[in-house]
Swiss-Prot record:
Gene induction: Induced in the liver, by peroxisome proliferator or fasting via the peroxisome proliferator-activated receptors (PPARs). Diurnal regulation of its expression.
Keywords in alphabetical order: Fatty acid metabolism, Hydrolase, Lipid metabolism, Peroxisome, Peroxisome biogenesis, Serine esterase
Keyword Hydrolase on entry: yes
Species this protein is from: Mus musculus (Mouse)
GO molecular function per UniProt: acetoacetyl-CoA hydrolase activity; acetyl-CoA hydrolase activity; carboxylic ester hydrolase activity; choloyl-CoA hydrolase activity; fatty acyl-CoA hydrolase activity; hydroxymethylglutaryl-CoA hydrolase activity; long-chain fatty acyl-CoA hydrolase activity; medium-chain fatty acyl-CoA hydrolase activity
Function: Catalyzes the hydrolysis of acyl-CoAs into free fatty acids and coenzyme A (CoASH), regulating their respective intracellular levels. Displays no strong substrate specificity with respect to the carboxylic acid moiety of Acyl-CoAs. Hydrolyzes medium length (C2 to C20) straight-chain, saturated and unsaturated acyl-CoAS but is inactive towards substrates with longer aliphatic chains. Moreover, it catalyzes the hydrolysis of CoA esters of bile acids, such as choloyl-CoA and chenodeoxycholoyl-CoA and competes with bile acid CoA:amino acid N-acyltransferase (BAAT).
UniProt-recorded name of the protein: Acyl-coenzyme A thioesterase 8
Misc. remarks from the entry: Constitutes about 1% of total peroxisomal protein.
Lineage: Eukaryota, Metazoa, Chordata, Craniata, Vertebrata
CDD domains listed in its UniProt record: Thioesterase_II_repeat1, Thioesterase_II_repeat2
Reaction catalysed by this enzyme: choloyl-CoA + H2O = cholate + CoA + H(+); chenodeoxycholoyl-CoA + H2O = chenodeoxycholate + CoA + H(+); acetyl-CoA + H2O = acetate + CoA + H(+); malonyl-CoA + H2O = malonate + CoA + H(+)
InterPro entries per record: ACOT8-like_C (IPR049450), Acyl-CoA_hotdog (IPR042171), Acyl_CoA_thio (IPR003703), HotDog_dom_sf (IPR029069), TesB_ACOT8-like_N (IPR049449)
Motif Microbody targeting signal positions after renumbering to this chain: 318-320
């Protein structure tokens, strides 16, 4: 992929004003920032901790891709990333990232990254980088037709609207208060948010507009891909829960693997539509697929993830 300039996004940052003099996105300055220790060896800190009190998988993926990208030349860019989460991460301990240069070719280069804590691997991945190659072989699906982000409530306003509803189901109220207490470095606007007055089974599909908070800029396509890795894991596996939340509650849920394919240049600090669906769940696992669309209809990234999901029956309020 080439640098993400001239993307054909007529909206660009028009809805944000000129942010070039604003603080750089915290995703760049802190969350995905790595300390070099030796050749192909880096240390990551500054971890965002979700309510699970484990490391957020998107941050580990993003940092691993940052480390891998530092070992390739400027003219090659990631086109695929395949990851396994092998142990739960400890948010109190730095993560060491070791990059192995598997192959450096004329067109493609492959890097393996191992993330280590307490002397053991918690995460492994392989990333493949490609030099830009024009080709007549081109097609893509069509982007879903949805309202633009300017017409939708942001995540904070939507949660506030839900919480002000006196008919909101108790289960949702507890979960929304927990989410509202978190500070995340991304902005989200949900498309067609459901009503939450009662527990209900929903279709295993969701869509939301998403972008990094703050300014990243145009020039560094590698960093935009690393930020997309972070973004892609947010609320992704939860898509598989939507048909079952009326009868069950989560006992344990964690990502097992995650794959990404990068198709076209994009800016992660511009709005992108994240289209998520779960085609299958079973055997205490759920499978989710996702597509990140640019506003001009270009398919930028495709994602897939499988995770472990262990449920327990929902206790009805009449039995309490």
């Amino acid at each position: 992929m080439s640098a993400p300039e001239g993307l054909g996004d007529a909206h660009g940052d028009a809805d944000r004003g000129d942010l070039s003099g604003d603080l750089r996105s915290v995703l760049v300055t802190s969350v995905l920032n790595l300390e070099p220790l030796d050749e192909d060896l880096y240390r990551g800190r500054h971890y965002w901790v979700p309510t699970s009190q484990r490391l957020f998988g998107g941050q580990i993926m993003g940092q691993a891709l940052v480390a891998a990208a530092k070992s390739v030349s400027e003219d090659v860019h990631v086109h695929s990333l395949h990851c396994y989460f092998v142990r739960a991460g400890d948010p109190k301990v730095p993560v060491l990232y070791h990059v192995e240069r598997i192959r450096t070719g004329a067109s493609f280069s492959v890097r393996a990254v191992k993330a280590v804590q307490h002397g053991k691997a918690i995460f492994i991945c392989q990333a493949s980088f490609q030099q830009m190659q024009p080709s007549p072989l081109q097609h893509q699906f069509s982007m879903p037709s949805v309202p633009p982000p300017e017409d939708l409530l942001d995540h904070e306003a939507l949660i506030d609207q839900y919480l002000r509803d006196p008919n909101l189901h108790k289960k949702y109220r507890v979960g929304l208060n927990r989410v509202a207490a978190q500070e995340v470095p991304i902005e989200i606007k949900v498309v067609n948010p459901p009503t939450l007055t009662q527990l209900q089974a929903l279709e295993p599909k969701q869509m939301f507009w998403v972008r990094a908070r703050g300014y990243i800029g145009e020039g560094d396509i590698k960093m935009h891909c690393c930020v997309a890795a972070y973004i892609s894991d947010y609320a992704f596996l939860g898509t598989a829960l939507l048909p079952h939340q009326s009868k069950y509650k989560v006992n344990f849920m964690a990502s097992l693997d995650h794959s990404m394919w990068f198709h076209a240049p994009f800016r992660a600090d511009h709005w992108m539509l994240y289209e998520c669906e779960s085609p299958w769940a079973g055997g205490s696992r759920g499978l989710v697929h996702g597509r990140l669309w640019r506003r001009d209809g270009v398919l930028a990234v495709t994602c897939a993830q499988e995770g472990v999901i262990r449920l327990k029956p929902q206790v009805s309020e009449s039995k309490l």
